[in-house]
């Protein structure tokens, strides 16, 4: 079943297929200048009794668990992955951007080093939709759960070869993040326009990112694994799901996979 073209919306109602009450699916962006929740989202949060994000973000052990998975396996370091010249370049870049010598952070997976620089892509104080959603859930005295464990999420970054991860980092260093900033701006514009189709096209076409090359690991396989969990939660109670917007569109996106299972998934406009 081909995915139909999606309307411009980040919030979707899941109903039918034996569900007693509607659940909601909201596409987040993990980093933005303004994470205010609009009225439709607030109403959906009022009408649900559980918040489920990609990870259980109010789990007190989350940071500790995360830290366990940020290092490369088998004592590998960036020095093993690049030539001498590129190593020098990365050293200067990391010192400049995160204020640490490469000898101290060289054993961290390149993906996580790239992520440390994400806040620099925005010229503002970074806000997150996940945090805003958690605030509301706590006000409503509701639980926050996750669709995957930290271990499962970390395995994603183990499945993408370190060589590919370091390619992204090196590209950022070579143009001093100019490409990253431009790409992120484009992504934010599409997100603010609620254009899931546009985001999907952008993901498919960006040949520079290892995440595009490994879309199956980053998105498709995870979406597939989430469906059963989304069904389980929704059958028990009206649930509000908040996951990265890139997970929603496309043939292997969460919206299409739920529709294939017989649910009605419609845009809240």
Where are these regions (language model features)?
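Bacterial Sec-dependent N-terminal signal peptides
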Residues: 1-7, 12
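A conditional alpha-helix N-cap/helix-loop micro-motif detector
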Residues: 4, 34, 219-223
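A generic structural signal for short, solvent-exposed coil/turn residues
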Residues: 4-6, 17-18, 45, 233
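Amphipathic coiled-coil/heptad-repeat helices and related helical stalk/stem segments
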Residues: 7, 37, 129-130, 223-226
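Tryptophan-centered motif/residue detector
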Residues: 10-12, 191, 226
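Structured, acidic catalytic/metal-binding patches in enzyme active sites
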Residues: 14-24, 29-210, 214
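A cross-kingdom marker for long, charged
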Residues: 212-269
């Amino acid at each position: 079943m081909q995915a139909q073209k999606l309307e411009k919306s980040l919030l979707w109602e899941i109903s039918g297929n034996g569900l007693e009450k509607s659940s909601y699916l909201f596409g987040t962006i993990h980093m933005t200048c303004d994470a205010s929740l609009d009225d439709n989202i607030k109403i959906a949060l009022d009408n649900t009794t559980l918040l489920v994000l990609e990870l259980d973000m109010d789990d007190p052990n989350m940071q500790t668990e995360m830290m366990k998975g940020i290092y490369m396996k088998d004592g590998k370091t960036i020095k093993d992955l690049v030539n001498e010249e590129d190593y020098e370049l990365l050293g200067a870049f990391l010192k400049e951007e995160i204020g640490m010598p490469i000898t101290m952070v060289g054993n961290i997976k390149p993906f996580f080093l790239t992520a440390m620089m994400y806040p620099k892509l925005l010229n503002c104080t970074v806000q997150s939709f996940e945090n805003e959603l958690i605030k509301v859930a706590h006000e409503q005295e509701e639980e926050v759960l996750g669709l995957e464990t930290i271990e499962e999420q970390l395995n994603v970054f183990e499945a993408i070869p370190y060589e590919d991860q370091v390619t992204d980092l090196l590209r950022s260093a070579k143009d001093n993040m100019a490409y990253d900033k431009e790409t992120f701006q484009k992504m934010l514009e599409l997100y603010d326009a609620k254009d899931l189709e546009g985001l999907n096209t952008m993901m498919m076409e960006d040949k520079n990112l290892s995440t595009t090359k490994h879309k199956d690991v980053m998105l498709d396989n995870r979406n597939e694994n989430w469906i059963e969990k989304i069904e389980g939660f929704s059958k028990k109670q009206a649930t509000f799901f908040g996951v990265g917007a890139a997970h929603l569109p496309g043939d292997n996106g969460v919206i299409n996979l739920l529709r294939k299972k017989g649910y009605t998934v419609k845009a809240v406009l």
